[in-house]
Amino acid sequence: VKMARAGSRISYGRIYKFERDSNVATVPIGYADGVPRRLSTNGGEVLIGGRRRAIVGRVTMDQIMVDCGDDEVRIGDDVVLLGSQDGPDGVQTIRAEDWADQLDTIGYEIVCGISARVPRFSRRSIED
């Protein structure tokens, strides 16, 4: 997690320019794990701290960068790509269908694209 100043650029080719000072989180997951590269340019979001956060810059093979704005985020905070998270405005949810709609595909393609590198957890195993 680091502060990106207004006007600074990040990512390959320095393609993303911050319009305001923002905390930016680097998340160790990318297209090799099943995050579609097209989310780079199609408004992809994840959940951190129970808020929707924009994926900024390019989805790379092993990481994404997420604009967290003014909110304080810390190393080790949970990041939800698909699923739900409690937040200050109630439960927020991102579904495979949300990404699919942005990418003009179907939810099954999103889910089937998640690679074996990503651990799977069921709600029951988390609660036990």
Please state what every model-predicted region is:
Residues 1-128:
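Active-site anion/phosphate-binding pocket segments in diverse small-molecule metabolic enzymes
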